[in-house]
Amino acid sequence: MLFRSGEEEKSEQEPLKIWGKIEGDKIVKTDDISITSQCIRVPVSDGHTAAVFMSFKDGVKKPTVEEIIDIWSNYSGRAQELDLPSAPKHFLHYFTEPDRPQIKSERNLENGMAVSVGRLRPDTQYDYKFVCMSHNTLRGAAGGAVLLAELLCAEGYMD
């Protein structure tokens, strides 16, 4: 296994920025969620896999497994609304098979731009747990940058 210093901290902090908001000239991280992580690198050619454990805030009605899958299955983001060239038609794909998602099977789904999710089930310590995976280069670094540029152009921030 390879170890990269700072990777776990980054995976805990970056989503808080992404889901945060801009106030003045600063990004204010969201405080709606709490993330903890442990990163383990294994020798695969392409793909990142995450085991996710989640709980809902007190006072929030906990959705059922079926409701969560329905939300994921019907999710459409701004990239889909604008029909951007690099955007997958369906950003999230939920798999009902107990052994999915798998990197070799799903990494190139929708030209590598989709996120594959599966194994959503109740957890004994948290409300739910699930597994998700995406292509680290196509959805991640390179493809993510292209999609972001397409979005900036479509929204009028770039020519």
Language model region names:
Residues 1-129:
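C-terminal substrate-binding/catalytic lobe of Rossmann-fold NAD(P)-dependent oxidoreductases
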Residues 109-159:
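NAD(P)-dependent Rossmann-like dehydrogenase/reductase catalytic/cofactor-binding core
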